[in-house]
């Protein structure tokens, strides 16, 4: 019996090595799941920057404005713009001698 390959059983019980029975539905399902897992893992490693950038930044598109009146939307835009404009004067100019 080899410990590193597959489990072998005595031939006299007519079990043999059951790893070669590829017609078993469980073996077929496990093979398909294994192949799909390998493909998804390879795609994840190849495109992980694109995938995780999409989930990190792509789904954050600001607060929902559904059901909010247009006047309140305009007020919110003005507040956001005034906050951006106020930050423009906070830059420090450093001159080296």
From Swiss-Prot:
The M2 protein from most influenza A strains is inhibited by amantadine and rimantadine, resulting in viral uncoating incapacity. Emergence of amantadine-resistant variants is usually rapid. Its main location: virion. A lipid is attached at residue 50 (S-palmitoyl cysteine). Glycans are attached at residue 20. It is a single-pass type III membrane protein. Residues 44-97 are intravirion. Keywords: Disulfide bond, Glycoprotein, Host cell membrane, Host membrane, Host-virus interaction, Hydrogen ion transport, Inhibition of host autophagy by virus, Ion channel, Ion transport, Lipoprotein, Membrane, Palmitate, Phosphoprotein, Signal-anchor, Transmembrane, Transmembrane helix, Transport, Viral ion channel, Virion. It is found in: Virion membrane; Host apical cell membrane. The keyword Glycoprotein applies. The record marks 37 as: Essential for channel activity, possibly by being protonated during channel activation, and by forming the channel gate and the selective filter. Residues 59-88 are annotated as: Disordered. One of its GO terms (cellular component) is membrane. Belongs to the influenza viruses matrix protein M2 family. When the channel is activated, one or more imidazole moieties of His-37 probably become bi-protonated. Forms a proton-selective ion channel that is necessary for the efficient release of the viral genome during virus entry. After attaching to the cell surface, the virion enters the cell by endocytosis. Acidification of the endosome triggers M2 ion channel activity. Homotetramer; composed of two disulfide-linked dimers held together by non-covalent interactions. May interact with matrix protein 1. This is Matrix protein 2.
């Amino acid at each position: 019996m080899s410990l590193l390959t597959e489990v072998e059983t005595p031939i006299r019980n007519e079990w043999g090595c059951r790893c070669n029975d590829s017609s078993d539905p469980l073996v077929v399902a496990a093979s398909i799941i294994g192949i799909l897992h390998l493909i998804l893992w390879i795609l994840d490693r190849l495109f992980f920057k694109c995938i995780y950038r999409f989930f990190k930044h792509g789904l954050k598109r600001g607060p929902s404005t559904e059901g909010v009146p247009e006047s309140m939307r305009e007020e919110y835009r003005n507040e956001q713009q005034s906050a951006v404009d106020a930050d423009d004067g906070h830059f420090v100019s450093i001159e080296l001698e």
